[in-house]
């Protein structure tokens, strides 16, 4: 999306060279034939041989480029996954491990780059040496064939070879660009040819042709069509208009796959799916777009105030809007980073409701909201504003089942039971498991109220790129020691080239009858030696540039990578992933393959033009007179052009990141976009962003043409003046042969002048990538990972006591305090429940405990150790946590359980058996090496959460934190998790952000937070004795909701 497209775009600059090069070569051969006769055949044969050598080299280079792109893909995929889950890595103290993973992938990419550059060095050596080789072979052939090499013939030949130099010298870049663009085009073509969603998976009917809104007949569906076991099988379903259908079942039973089959997202193996009416979809994992809350709710629809207010009220968002300074116009960070899980869930429910669809597919819509909000959502939204709509909702919360017209109980991908709530209870064949102790209600989620702008605009430099940027780049490797050697090698090449041509012009006889000054054999031997020396200088120069450029790129990458990994979470909250990925892909690619070459070309072209001016001034010093005003004009044009081009290039670079960001967001929400039939709108938005990027880029190209035209005019003027001067000089003033040599060099002057300015501007353009990478190499860092003189004991924390003393936390100096004067103590080995309304500060307390945010005042002491005095790795690696985001990483089950490779297979299997995943993993052919795709999409949400449980079972920390860890799993799985935690962490400290009542009641102590302060802190029993306590009110609220189940449960006895 970034590098491949950019390479194809860059190739446009070289398109004309493809057809111009053969014309230039054959035109040169024709001119040679006129002056050297049959000797020109030698030039033709040698040229064809050089070109033939390029064919195998080009094929090999294409393979290397393909390897580079594959290695880059692996690195970028890992980088993207890490950036999305950086909070998990920091909480688990895995950041160093995953940093090393990216470094390993970069090492693989580096090896591929080095192979490619070595081959490119060899290709450059051949092609830059080609003009000299062709001239030597041609002159030797002429000598052997008896062709007289007069001064006129030699100068004509040298002029022809001089004309060939520029296109042949540019051939390595042309071939490199051709190969890179071909590889990129093939990769894009391969991507475009991949299979798409089945277009005939769902039959859409009008309401007049069927009485059912949703109908599935003999359906079988699979996420992996090649698997012998379908994900869903024998599905028979008929849903009439206006019905409310609840879907429940255990973890991995196929609950979420059923709505996907109705949407056509899962591969249909057999059967028929018919849908009548407009659909709206709410996924299990909230998908939130960057932008305002209102934009997310409207989702492209027209704003209607009355309809909007009804929607917002039905989705219980009024109070949330009051928490924000800008209400529903508050900006949402990337992936809703500054919103709680409950808020994100309600926003996407509001998005669905506002669409006024006929059919609503809600995948676990109540899991992330508190008990009070859940009741409001169900009554006001599902049974209120959507009362006449067809609704299919997945849920594991049994209190929402009795109101359903139909309940589907899923097991192993099949509908095992179907009917109304009372009917299923009477059947007494397993449904009652879902109703056991139905105390699984959410109490609250967390919100971080921030007044300032969350997502910061990209910082761009203004004006001239600072000298320190150039200096940093040039001196990064060995203090810049390679730079003078590179310039020396190019200078030697230029001097040897001039010397060889001067030698031929000076020694060649003026006429066929004249006697040469030296024997022709000796003349050609000296010429060949000088040409060989110049070719060796080219080889030395290309090797030094490759070594210096790639080493510098690697150093810059390493610094940027370490800087990003050590950045605090506030950086990731305010910086879109697309912006960081743009640095790690497009900008890093410039450093890898282009930056050193572009800077080198600047030096080379300047040295070439200095050499040309030197030769012309040796012929007639008067030529220098015209060079002075021309040089002034060139500098004027360059200074007039460069600032414009530089700012346009910066604008183009800045506009590229939103394209990547929008593409990534669209990819993540593709199912929702298709369900809402919003594909055209997102494609249009993407095209608008592409236009915004292309607009400044087009002006960059136009400005370049503007400059080239004026420089060419100046060059032709200088050349014309030189010719007139040489013709008008009196006879005998200068050697005619040397004058001819001056004219020969003057022929390339117009190209060289344009090349110098173009290379300077192009290098400055590419230097912007260096500037941006340097910005990301200087991100303020977190506290040190390890402080050697403050390291805790190996068995710390052995008691598990946690003491908060006057703790205050704010997310930035200009943000309001989120936690205010928190003072309390969690005794070691006790179970602590933390509850509170939205925005009370629960999750912030946990983040402060792990130092994801640093206290602005006060201390946190664990087992008599002030955690702000020790290293972050020492702190985080000693604490265990099951976070709300159950992230799995691309790889295997083994990698996800034990990324640090600390445990044996036996210990891993024990942990899997304890968390009820042992049999599931054993059923896989790969066992512990079973595949986990990106984000763990091939595992259910519940299974992902059990894997997270397996991690803490292996870690065996004396302090365990549960941050709404079971919000998205069914009652049975939640019971399993609670049972395991009670058994395995019996004498250890467990801090639970409570989302279900029974986890709080069974705690030893309950901490109630309100508006960032401690409202209550005592045992559940004592809090319940106080009827006015916040905790008592929560229990009463839950009891009122649960009373109507009592009668139903009696049917089971």
Curated annotation (Swiss-Prot):
Residues 1-180, 483-765 form the ABC transmembrane type-1 domain. The chain crosses the membrane at residues 11-31, 36-56, 125-145, 151-171, 481-503, 523-543, 595-615, 714-734, 738-758. Its EC number is 7.6.2.2. Its main location: membrane. GO terms for molecular function: ABC-type xenobiotic transporter activity; ATP binding; ATP hydrolysis activity; ATPase-coupled transmembrane transporter activity. Coiled coil: none annotated. It is a multi-pass membrane protein. InterPro entries: AAA+_ATPase, ABC1_TM_dom, ABC1_TM_sf, ABC_transporter-like_ATP-bd, ABC_transporter-like_CS, ABC_transporter_C-like, ABCC_6TM_D1, ABCC_6TM_D2. ATP 1 binds at residues 249-256. CDD domains: ABC_6TM_ABCC_D1, ABC_6TM_ABCC_D2, ABCC_MRP_domain1, ABCC_MRP_domain2. Gene3D superfamilies: ABC transporter type 1, transmembrane domain, P-loop containing nucleotide triphosphate hydrolases. GO terms for cellular component: membrane. It catalyses: ATP + H2O + xenobioticSide 1 = ADP + phosphate + xenobioticSide 2. It holds the Pfam family ABC_membrane. Keywords: ATP-binding, Membrane, Nucleotide-binding, Repeat, Translocase, Transmembrane, Transmembrane helix, Transport. It is found in: Membrane. SUPFAM superfamilies: ABC transporter transmembrane region (SSF90123), P-loop containing nucleoside triphosphate hydrolases (SSF52540). ATP 2 binds at residues 836-843. Pump for glutathione S-conjugates. Belongs to the ABC transporter superfamily. ABCC family. Conjugate transporter (TC 3.A.1.208) subfamily. This is Putative ABC transporter C family member 15.
């Amino acid at each position: 999306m970034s590098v491949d497209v950019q390479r194809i775009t860059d190739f446009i600059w070289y398109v004309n060279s493809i057809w111009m090069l053969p014309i230039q070569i054959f035109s040169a051969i024709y001119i040679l034939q006129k002056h050297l006769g049959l000797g020109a055949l030698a030039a033709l044969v040698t040229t064809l041989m050089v070109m033939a050598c390029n064919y195998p080299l080009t094929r090999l280079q294409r393979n290397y480029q393909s390897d580079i792109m594959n290695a880059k893909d692996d690195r970028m995929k890992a980088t993207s996954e890490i950036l999305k889950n950086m909070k998990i890595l920091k909480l688990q103290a895995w950041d160093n491990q995953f940093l090393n993973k990216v470094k390993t992938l970069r090492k693989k990419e580096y090896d591929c780059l080095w192979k490619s550059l070595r081959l490119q060095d060899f290709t450059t050596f051949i092609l830059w040496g080609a003009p000299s080789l062709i001239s030597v072979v041609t002159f030797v052939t002429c000598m052997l064939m008896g062709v007289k090499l007069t001064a006129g013939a030699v100068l004509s030949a040298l002029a022809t070879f001089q004309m060939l130099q520029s296109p042949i010298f540019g051939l390595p870049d042309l071939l490199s660009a051709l190969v890179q663009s071909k590889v990129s085009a093939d990769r894009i073509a391969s991507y475009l040819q991949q299979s798409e969603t089945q277009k005939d998976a769902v039959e859409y009917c009008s309401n007049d042709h069927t009485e059912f809104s949703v109908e599935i007949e003999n359906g079988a569906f699979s996420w992996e069509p090649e698997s012998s076991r379908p994900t869903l099988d024998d599905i028979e379903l008929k849903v009439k208009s206006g019905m409310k259908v609840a879907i429940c079942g255990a973890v991995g039973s196929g609950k979420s796959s059923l709505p996907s089959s109705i949407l056509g997202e899962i591969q249909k193996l057999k059967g028929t799916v018919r849908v009548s009416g407009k659909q709206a979809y709410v996924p299990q994992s909230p998908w939130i777009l960057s932008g305002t809350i209102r934009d997310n709710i409207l989702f492209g629809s027209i704003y209607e105030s009355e309809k909007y207010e009804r929607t917002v009220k039905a989705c219980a968002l009024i109070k949330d809007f009051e928490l924000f300074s800008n209400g529903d116009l508050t900006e949402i960070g990337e992936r809703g980073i500054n919103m709680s899980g409950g808020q994100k869930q309600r926003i996407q429910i509001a998005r669905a409701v506002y669409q006024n669809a006929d059919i609503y597919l809600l995948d676990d819509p109540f899991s992330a909201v508190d008990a009070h909000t859940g009741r409001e959502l169900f009554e006001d939204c599902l049974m209120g504003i959507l009362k006449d709509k067809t609704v299919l909702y997945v849920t594991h919360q049994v209190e929402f089942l009795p109101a359903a017209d139909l309940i589907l109980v899923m097991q192993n991908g099949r509908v095992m039971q179907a009917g109304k709530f009372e009917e299923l209870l009477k059947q007494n064949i397993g449904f009652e498991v879902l109703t056991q102790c139905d105390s699984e209600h959410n109490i609250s989620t967390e919100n971080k109220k921030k007044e300032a702008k969350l997502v910061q605009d990209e910082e761009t430099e203004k004006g001239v790129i600072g000298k320190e940027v150039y200096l940093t780049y040039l001196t990064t490797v060995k203090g810049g020691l390679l730079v003078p050697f590179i310039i020396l090698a190019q200078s030697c090449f230029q001097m040897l080239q001039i010397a060889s041509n001067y030698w031929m012009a000076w020694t060649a006889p003026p006429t066929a009858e004249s006697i040469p000054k030296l024997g022709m054999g000796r003349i050609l031997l000296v010429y060949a030696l000088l040409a060989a020396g110049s070719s060796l200088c080219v080889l030395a120069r290309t090797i030094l540039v490759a070594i210096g450029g790639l080493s510098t790129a690697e150093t810059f990458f390493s610094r940027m990578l370490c800087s990003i990994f050590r950045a605090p979470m506030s950086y990731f909250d305010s910086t879109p992933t697309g912006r960081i990925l743009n640095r790690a892909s497009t900008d890093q690619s410039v450093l890898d393959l282009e930056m050193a070459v572009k800077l080198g070309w600047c030096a080379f072209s300047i040295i070439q033009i200095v050499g040309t001016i030197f030769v012309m001034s040796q012929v007639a010093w008067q030529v220098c007179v015209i060079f002075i005003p021309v040089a002034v004009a060139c500098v004027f044009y360059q200074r007039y052009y460069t600032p414009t081009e530089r700012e346009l290039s910066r604008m183009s670079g800045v506009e590229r990141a939103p394209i990547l960001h929008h593409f990534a967001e669209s990819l993540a929400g593709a199912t929702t976009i298709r369900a809402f039939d919003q594909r055209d709108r997102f494609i249009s938005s993407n095209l608008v962003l592409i236009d915004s990027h292309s607009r400044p880029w087009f002006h960059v190209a136009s400005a370049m043409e503007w400059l080239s035209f004026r420089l060419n005019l100046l060059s032709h003027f200088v050349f014309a003046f030189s010719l007139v001067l040489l013709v008008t000089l009196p006879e005998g003033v200068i050697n005619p042969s040397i004058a001819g040599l001056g004219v020969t060099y003057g022929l390339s002057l117009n190209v060289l002048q344009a090349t110098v300015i173009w290379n300077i501007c192009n290098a400055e353009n590419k230097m912007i990538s260096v500037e941006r990478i340097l910005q990301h190499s200087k991100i303020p860092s977190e506290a040190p990972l390890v402080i050697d003189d403050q390291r805790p004991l190996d068995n710390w924390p052995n008691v598990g006591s946690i003491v908060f003393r006057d703790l205050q936390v704010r997310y930035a100096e200009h943000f309001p305090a989120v936690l205010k004067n928190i003072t309390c103590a969690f005794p070691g080995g006790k179970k602590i429940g933390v509850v509170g309304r939205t925005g009370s500060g629960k999750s912030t307390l946990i983040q402060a405990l792990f130092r994801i945010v640093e206290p602005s005042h006060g201390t946190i002491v664990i087992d008599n150790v002030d955690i702000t005095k020790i290293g972050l790795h020492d702190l985080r690696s000693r604490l265990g946590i099951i976070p709300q985001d159950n992230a799995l990483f691309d790889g295997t089950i083994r990698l996800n359980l034990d990324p640090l490779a600390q445990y044996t297979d036996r210990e891993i299997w024990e942990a899997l058996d304890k968390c009820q995943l042992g049999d599931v993993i054993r059923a896989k052919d790969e066992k512990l090496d079973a595949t986990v795709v990106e984000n763990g999409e091939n595992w259910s949400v519940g299974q992902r959460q059990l894997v997270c449980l397996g991690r803490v079972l292996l870690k065996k920390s004396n302090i365990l934190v549960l941050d709404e860890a079971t919000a998205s799993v069914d009652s049975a799985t939640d019971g399993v998790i609670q049972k395991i935690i009670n058994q395995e962490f019996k004498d250890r400290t467990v801090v639970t952000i409570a989302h279900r009542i029974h986890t709080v009641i069974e705690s030893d102590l309950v901490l109630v937070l309100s508006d960032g302060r401690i409202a209550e802190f005592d045992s559940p029993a004592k809090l319940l004795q106080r009827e006015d306590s916040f905790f008592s009110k929560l229990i009463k609220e839950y009891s009122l909701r649960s009373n109507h189940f009592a009668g139903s449960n009696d049917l089971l006895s």
